A protein has these predicted regions:
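N-terminal nucleotide-binding beta1-loop-alpha1 segment
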Residues: 1-13
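A short, N-terminal amphipathic alpha-helix
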Residues: 25-43
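Acidic donor-binding segment of Leloir-type glycosyltransferases
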Residues: 42-66
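Short phosphate-binding loop-to-helix
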Residues: 57-90, 149
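Short aromatic-hydrophobic micro-motifs that form the base-stacking/packing surface
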Residues: 92-94
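Conserved donor-nucleotide/metal-binding helix-loop-beta segment in metal-dependent transferases, i.e.
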Residues: 99-127
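Short, glycine-/small-residue-rich phosphate/pyrophosphate-handling segment
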Residues: 134-157
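Conserved alpha/beta core of the MobA/IspD/sugar-nucleotide pyrophosphorylase nucleotidyltransferase superfamily
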Residues: 154-189
Length: 189
């Protein structure tokens, strides 16, 4: 899932610290890198975009990248829409701001979906960098989740309605300059 990578529309918390141009450049670079690095014959990489009109703006995207609109609603409603669209297949949703995501981590997520209805990849900030699902969706999936908070992951798990889930290793997403600096420190050691 990604927002239109234009100044003022992405990484707004990071932009307050480093400026809108730098934050947007970082996001564009990271998003393209993620798409390139996760391309694999074992799964389809599909970019779900917001606003929906951005799907038609092909100048940013390579023609071989499959893009779909996110649709209306809050983040939970948009993710629910994606899971419904791919209801007949195990599906994983990630954001474009997770630098250390790898094919191995995605492969593990799909393997875990072989025995569970959900898989989550917890983020350092209390959210998640990946959520995967297979089968019928719980009726109240994502309802009442406090987005962009330390409770996002725990609130989300509560909406699974006791369906079994697995967890992946914790990763850092990038929302602030401190996140970027922490990431740089981790990769230099």
């Amino acid at each position: 899932m990604a927002k239109e990578p234009l100044p003022g529309r992405v990484k707004t918390r990071l932009a307050r610290e480093v400026g809108s141009t730098v934050a947007t450049w970082w996001f564009r670079h990271q998003l393209k890198k993620t798409i390139r690095n996760l391309n694999d014959p074992r799964w389809d990489v599909i970019v779900s975009l917001s606003p929906d009109i951005f799907v038609k703006r092909r100048n940013f995207w390579s023609p071989e990248i499959n893009c779909i609109p996110q649709g209306r609603g809050n983040l939970g409603q948009k993710m629910r829409n994606i899971f419904k669209l791919f209801a007949n297949h195990p599906s994983c949703i990630i954001g474009g701001d997770i630098p250390n995501i790898t094919k191995l981590k995605i492969s593990k997520a799909f393997r875990k979906l072989g025995s569970r209805k959900f898989v989550v990849g917890p983020a350092e900030d209390g959210g998640f960098w990946l959520i995967g699902h297979q089968g019928q969706l719980p009726r109240k999936l994502f309802e009442g989740v406090r987005w962009s908070s330390p409770w996002t992951l725990s609130d989300t798990i509560e909406t699974f309605e006791d369906q079994p889930f697995s967890s992946l290793s914790k990763l850092q997403d990038v929302d602030s300059l401190a996140d970027l600096e922490a990431l740089k420190t981790k990769t230099n050691h």
